[in-house]
């Protein structure tokens, strides 16, 4: 039986089984999902059970998770916002990387006895925090979109940029660096700049036409394929240019941040991002050489303690120098005190160039992994310290955070942007209410641009698209689409996922109305009925009937129709109810008999009377 089992499939099953058992356990214990992934990877890696013998291949594949994560972050960074963050990126980011690098380099030289070159590589590798761990931590705490979270992200962006000159410095530190020529360096810089410019041009002028073309085909999987093409293509372009793949994905995300397709892209990428990011953390855990740890545990713990303490101190000092308060400085310190995945790239390049030995590479890599293992624990300790001085009242909050809170007020999510929804949106905007709209029709999106509405391309029937569009922040949802099946499907999903979220919708027929009433939809406007009632009132008044009397007649019709609707809701869809209520019947008995004015009408009416007589006898 075991001979028939596919060993590769067996590894995949074990990977999934270990993650779905260990990660929720660590999450429940309050240690975070990242530590759970790292421990799960360590257990199935070559140092423990040996189920996966080549963790490097897993890490290389799973790096795409980090790439996709940066793409999603880029989607939330409008170019204007990124420009507004330039001081934080090149100011606080440069200061933090510079001070951390200097402090750790000198610590390695004078406290660990390393050579200048080796100490520089080790110190700068540890200076670069793990983008994956920091972003995951921010997301779990709901801080990604806050001002504090944005300031952390700005530093991460600079660290992603810093890997480029650090890799270039390896060539100068190498024993045979004299062989490199200035011409070669300028060519490398030219290729890198060309990759960046090419990516920006592609994102600005080619991306939107591409997705408009794909959307017209109305093939959902093609949108997913297009999203993956954008992310992986951008990553490949940057890698060819000698830059970070994650940086390429981030730039692509920023270029698409103002596109009407951004929420659809985010929804399509999200499942791949989550799985691959978890796999990345497991791959890092697999890479930990426990034999090296046990043989040199005193040295490793000394390196980890020294570097974490040094980096944490530098992060805190820079935060305070740049006028961040004590609580935020501690939060940044706990988030960024560890080493990151870029250290593996730097150590590998340095070992290849013979700047550091293979033994030193293995030792420094193990130290970085151990620091990543400690990261969730450090964050937990820091969180408890912060909670002691957490503001209890709204007036104590950071004034920049108040902008985030205000943005969530009076937010309405409208699904469908036809003529019906356009009128609804204009009414809301006159009152100053924030409106977000989802539509999958390209022409509707183009029309919306003339009104200045926030309209995004996406299928409102997909819950992941709704989440990406901000349904969790919405005060209510308005359904303006004209497809009754899609209306019922959307309502069913939202009632299950967000039972307390008010839903207001339009309907065309009684059957859909009855179904939505049973699902406790908050408000239903029946277009046919309301249009007919309005026209009836106008007709009565045009015939000279007093307005008060006309209103009384309309009120009576509404009452009789409501009684009929209540019975339809109560008794369901039996044949008797359909026959009794869903065939047109007058609310009250006509005062005069029906008269046929031509022969054809007389034949039709006679057939109808015979049918009713036979039904009564049966």
Swiss-Prot record:
GO terms for molecular function: antiporter activity; monoatomic cation transmembrane transporter activity. Signal peptide: none annotated. The keyword Ion transport applies. GO terms for biological process: potassium ion transport; proton transmembrane transport. InterPro entries: Cation/H_exchanger_TM, K/H_exchanger, Na+/solute_symporter_sf, NAD(P)-bd_dom_sf, RCK_N. PANTHER family: GLUTATHIONE-REGULATED POTASSIUM-EFFLUX SYSTEM PROTEIN, K(+) EFFLUX ANTIPORTER 3, CHLOROPLASTIC. Belongs to the monovalent cation:proton antiporter 2 (CPA2) transporter (TC 2.A.37) family. Transport system that facilitate potassium-efflux, possibly by potassium-proton antiport. This is Glutathione-regulated potassium-efflux system protein. The gene is kefBC.
């Amino acid at each position: 039986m075991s001979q028939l089992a596919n060993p590769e499939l067996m590894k995949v099953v074990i990977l999934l089984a270990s993650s779905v058992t260990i990660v929720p356990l660590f999450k429940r214990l309050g240690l975070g999902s990242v530590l759970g992934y790292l421990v799960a990877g360590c257990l199935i890696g070559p140092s423990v059970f040996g189920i996966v013998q080549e963790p490097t291949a897993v890490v290389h594949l799973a790096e795409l998770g980090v790439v996709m994560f940066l793409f999603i972050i880029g989607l939330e960074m409008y170019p204007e916002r990124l420009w507004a963050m330039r001081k934080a990126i090149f100011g606080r980011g440069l200061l933090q990387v510079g001070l951390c690098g200097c402090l750790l380099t000198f610590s390695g030289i004078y406290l660990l006895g390393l050579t200048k070159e080796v100490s520089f590589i080790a110190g700068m590798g540890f200076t670069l925090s793990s983008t994956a761990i920091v972003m995951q931590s921010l997301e779990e705490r709901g801080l990604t979109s806050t001002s504090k979270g944005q300031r952390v992200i700005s530093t991460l962006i600079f660290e992603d940029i810093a890997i480029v000159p650090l890799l270039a410095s390896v060539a100068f530190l190498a024993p045979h660096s004299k062989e490199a020529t200035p011409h070669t360096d300028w060519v490398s810089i030219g290729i890198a700049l060309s990759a960046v410019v090419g990516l920006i041009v592609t994102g600005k002028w080619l991306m939107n036409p591409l997705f408009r073309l794909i959307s017209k085909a109305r093939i959902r999987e093609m949108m997913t394929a297009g999203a993956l093409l954008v992310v992986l293509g951008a990553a490949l372009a940057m890698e060819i240019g000698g830059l970070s793949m994650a940086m390429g994905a981030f730039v692509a995300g920023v270029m698409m941040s103002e596109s009407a397709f951004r929420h659809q892209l985010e929804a399509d990428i999200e499942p791949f991002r989550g799985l691959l990011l978890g796999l990345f953390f497991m791959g890092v855990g697999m890479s930990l050489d426990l034999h090296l740890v046990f043989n040199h545990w005193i040295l490793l713990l000394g390196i980890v303690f020294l570097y974490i303490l040094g980096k944490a101190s530098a992060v805190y000092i820079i935060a305070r120098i740049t006028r961040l308060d004590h609580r935020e400085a501690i939060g940044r310190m706990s988030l960024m005190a560890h080493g990151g995945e870029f250290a593996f790239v730097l150590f590998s390049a340095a070992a290849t160039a013979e700047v550091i030995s293979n033994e030193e590479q293995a030792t420094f890599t193990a130290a970085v992994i151990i620091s990543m293992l400690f990261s969730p624990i450090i964050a937990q300790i820091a969180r408890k310290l912060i909670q002691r001085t957490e503001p209890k009242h709204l007036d104590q909050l950071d004034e920049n955070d108040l902008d985030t809170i205000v943005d969530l007020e009076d937010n309405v999510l409208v699904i469908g942007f036809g003529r019906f929804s356009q009128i609804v949106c204009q009414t809301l905007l006159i009152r100053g209410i924030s409106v977000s709209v989802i539509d999958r029709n390209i022409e509707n999106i183009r029309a919306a641009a003339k009104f200045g509405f926030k309209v995004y391309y996406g299928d409102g029937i997909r819950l992941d698209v709704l989440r990406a569009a901000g349904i969790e922040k919405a005060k209510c949802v308005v359904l303006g689409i004209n497809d009754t099946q899609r209306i019922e499907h959307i309502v069913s999903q939202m009632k299950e996922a967000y039972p307390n979220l008010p839903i207001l919708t339009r309907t065309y027929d009684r059957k859909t109305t009855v179904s939505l009433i049973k699902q406790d939809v908050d408000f239903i406007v029946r277009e046919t009925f309301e249009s007919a009632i309005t026209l009836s009132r106008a007709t009565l008044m045009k015939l000279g009937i007093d307005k008060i009397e006309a209103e009384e007649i309309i009120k009576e019709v509404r009452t009789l129709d409501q009684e009929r609707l209540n019975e339809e809701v109560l008794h369901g869809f039996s044949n008797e109810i359909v026959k009794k209520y869903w065939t047109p019947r007058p609310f009250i008995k006509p005062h005069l008999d029906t008269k046929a004015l031509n022969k054809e009408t007389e034949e039709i009416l006679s057939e109808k009377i015979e049918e009713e007589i036979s039904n009564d006898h049966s």
